[in-house]
Amino acid sequence: MTDKVRLTTMVQAAGUAAKLGPAGLEEAIHDITRSDDPNLIVGVEGAEDAGIYRIGENLALVETTDIITPLVDDPFTFGRIAAANALSDVYAMGGRPVTAMNLAFFPACSLPTSVLAAILAGGSAALKEAGTCLVGGHTVEDDELKFGLAVTGLIDPARVVRNCTARPGDLIVITKPLGTGIISTAIKAEMIEPEVEAEATRWMTTLNAKAADLMVACRATAATDVTGFGFIGHACEMALGAKVSFKIELARVPVIPGVPALIDDGMVPAGCYRNRQHYEQHVSGNSGDPLLPLFDPQTSGGLLITFAPDDARTFLSRAGKEGLFAACIGEVEPAGGTPIVFV
C-alpha cells in the first residue's frame, strides 16, 4: 500500500520549506540568551548549524536536530532524505555523527503504520551509510506527517569549522547544485519530469560526509550547509557573522537541470519568496527571477565553504579525483556595501 500513498499531498509545505521563516524565527528566539557554562563552545548566540559542548581536553559533543515534512512521495526515500538532512549539520561543523534518535509525527488515522515503517527504514539506511548508531526515538500522533532526527556527533574542539570565520581573500565553494525546493513543489503538483525528480532525489540522499572530511583536511576557514533559508540566506549568515562581503559569480552557481523551466511554470514554493523578502536587502548586483533558485529553500543541501586560495584549489582537485561535486563560485572581500554582491 505504501507505493500508492502520495505523501506530498498530505502536507502544506515540503521539506525545509516548511520551517518557520527567517523573520519569524529571529523574533521568536530574540530573548534566548547564551548559557554561561564554560564548556559551551558554540551555543544559541549565532546562526551556527549545531551546538558544540566540550567534554574533554580534545573532545566535544556536536548536537543538532532537524525535522521535515515529505518532499517526495515514496516513504523510504523520504526517510532517507530526512536523515541525510539531519546528519548534515554535524558534517557542516566538521564533526562525525555517532548517535541519532528518530522523531516521528504521524497521522495514524489517515496512513497505515506500514508507511511509518518504510520511513524509519529509509532513515536507518542513511544512518547505516553514515556509520551512525540509532539509539531510540519518539513518536507523536499528528495531523501532518513529519520526520527527523536528533543527532549527536564528536569533534576535536580545535578543529571546529564555524560559519562566521571567513576571511577576505578566501575562495567560496559549494558542493551540491540548487533547486530542490522548486522541484519538490513540482512533485507535489505532479508537474515534474521523472529524470528531474530522480536527479533531485540523488542529491538529497547524498550524505555530506565525504565532502566534510575533505573540507577539514583542506583547512576550511568557514562552512555551513545550505538548507531552509536558501543559498542567499545562509551565505548572508556567513558574511554578516564574519563582517565580510561575499562576491558571487551568478553564472557559476550550480542549479539542477530543469529548475529554470519549473520556475517559468510557477513551481516556486512560498518559502522562496519569504526568503527573498527577508534577505534581498542584503543583496546587490542582480535581482528578480534569476535569483529565485538562490532563495529556494533546500533540503539536504550541499556545504558552502570558504578556503584560502591554495587550499581551495587543493579541495577542488581532490574532490574531482574522489568523484565529489564541487564548484568555486566566488571570493570573500572586505566588508563594504551589501554582504552579498553578484557579478
From Swiss-Prot:
The EC number(s) this enzyme carries: 2.7.9.3
Top enzyme class: transferase
GO CC entries: cytoplasm
Binding site for Mg(2+): 49, 89, 225
Catalytic residues in the record: 16
Cofactor mode of binding and number, as noted: Binds 1 Mg(2+) ion per monomer.
Catalytic activity: hydrogenselenide + ATP + H2O = selenophosphate + AMP + phosphate + 2 H(+)
Binding sites annotated in the UniProt record for ATP: 19, 46-48, 66, 89, 137-139
Cofactor entry: Mg(2+)
GO molecular function, one term: ATP binding
GO biological process: selenocysteine biosynthetic process
This protein's UniProt keywords: ATP-binding, Kinase, Magnesium, Metal-binding, Nucleotide-binding, Selenium, Selenocysteine, Transferase
InterPro entries: PurM-like_C_dom, PurM-like_C_sf, PurM-like_N, PurM-like_N_sf, SelD_I, SPS/SelD
Site entry (Important for catalytic activity), positions: 19
Function, as annotated: Synthesizes selenophosphate from selenide and ATP.
The protein's assembly and partners: Homodimer.
Family: Belongs to the selenophosphate synthase 1 family. Class I subfamily.
Protein name, entry field: Selenide, water dikinase
Organism whose genome encodes this protein: Citrifermentans bemidjiense (strain ATCC BAA-1014 / DSM 16622 / JCM 12645 / Bem) (Geobacter bemidjiensis)
